[in-house]
């Protein structure tokens, strides 16, 4: 078990109730009456990638209130048993161990998992989650204190840098960007693991010199002032898909219609959140879940100050291939991975452009 710089342990938490640490999911679905002609809904064991809404939208789309008021097939075709992980590497571990059927993975963890063939039967990318590096939208950004002598990436040599988990998307973006400036991430800096919510405090308390901030924590910390940006993920890869939804091939083979229903509700929920008519309630339930003040969320959530998301859940192979190629170019993986061979977007409710 890894322990981060903040002393927190990487642990697995099952959903028990509505709240920050846990989300109403499988135990709070609609009652289902078994009949001779009906089947129980398929339970989907889902592992998150370490973020919460409004970072990972699945964490808010399948909340209890959404199940009862928005989602059409929850409790009928499927239910969700959601495990909150510290990062995408842990989510991949659960897939490999047969303890999760679907998950949010980063491009980095996905490519590594494919090359190592860690998931029995393999897996497919079935929908996008969010993308980084799109002009005019939020980007995962590495910050230092305002009065820090660090002004450019080259100034990070010899510094201590915080990321959420080794092998995560932000970790790979960091390593690629450092190498672009001739800095060896294994020798010239110290990279440490810190849970996303604790990175901002770690920077301010000078336990690290630099750290990555993602939404919603980035917006909260920027509002406090005293920080300055050094670089973001787009500087390493250009526009790219940071995280996406995957399903194991074994689960897809046995429960294809359940995954189709899950994704149909995901897109329905995503569009519900983006609908201006629902904004007040969307902010309320997200605030209740994340414990972020509603007035703070209202400043960026589901606006151009938020991440870029395809509202149909579509993602092109290109925006995943680009950072994966960067990994090979920088020696972080030793073989190419053709992403298009590991995609199945046919279960989404709409048609995606090739």
Regions found by a protein language model. Give the residues of each.
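C-terminal segment of N-terminal export signals and the immediately downstream linker at the start
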Residues: 9, 30-45
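Short, glycine-/small- and polar/acidic-enriched structural segments
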Residues: 39-184, 190-193, 209-215, 239
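Secondary-structure end/capping motifs
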Residues: 51, 253-334
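Small-molecule pocket liners
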Residues: 131-142, 227-228, 241-250, 323-324
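Conserved C-terminal helix/tail region of periplasmic/extracytoplasmic solute-binding proteins
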Residues: 324-354
């Amino acid at each position: 078990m890894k322990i981060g710089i903040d002393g927190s342990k990487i642990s697995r938490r099952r959903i028990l109730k509505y709240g920050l640490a846990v989300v109403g999911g499988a135990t709070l679905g609609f009652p289902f009456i078994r009949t001779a002609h009906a089947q129980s809904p398929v339970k989907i064991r889902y592992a998150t990638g370490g973020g919460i809404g409004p970072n990972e939208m699945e964490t808010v789309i399948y909340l209890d209130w959404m199940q009862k008021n928005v989602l059409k097939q929850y409790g009928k075709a499927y239910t969700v048993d959601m495990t909150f992980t510290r990062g995408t590497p842990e989510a991949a571990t659960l897939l490999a161990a047969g303890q999760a059927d679907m998950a949010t993975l980063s491009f980095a963890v996905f490519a590594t998992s494919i090359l190592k063939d860690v998931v029995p039967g393999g897996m497919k990318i079935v929908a996008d989650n969010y993308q980084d590096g799109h002009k005019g939208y939020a980007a995962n950004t590495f910050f230092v204190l305002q009065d820090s002598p660090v002004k450019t990436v080259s100034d990070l040599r010899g510094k201590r840098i915080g990321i959420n988990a080794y092998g995560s998307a932000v970790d790979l973006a960091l390593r690629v960007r450092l190498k672009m400036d001739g800095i060896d991430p294994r020798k010239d800096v110290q990279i440490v693991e810190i849970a996303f919510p604790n990175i901002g405090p770690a920077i301010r308390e000078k336990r690290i010199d630099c750290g990555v901030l993602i939404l919603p924590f980035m917006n909260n910390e920027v509002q406090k002032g005293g920080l300055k940006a050094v670089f973001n993920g787009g500087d390493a890869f250009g526009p790219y898909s940071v995280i996406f939804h995957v399903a194991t091939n074994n689960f897809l083979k046995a429960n294809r219609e359940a995954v189709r229903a899950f994704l149909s509700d995901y897109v329905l929920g995503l569009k519900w959140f983006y609908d201006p008519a629902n904004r007040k309630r969307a902010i309320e339930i997200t605030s209740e879940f994340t414990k972020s003040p509603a007035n703070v969320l209202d400043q960026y959530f589901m606006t151009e100050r938020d991440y870029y998301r395809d509202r149909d859940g579509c993602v092109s192979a290109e925006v995943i291939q680009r950072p994966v190629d960067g990994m090979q170019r920088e020696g972080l993986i030793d073989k190419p991975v053709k992403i298009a061979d590991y995609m199945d977007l046919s279960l989404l409710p709409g048609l995606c452009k090739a």
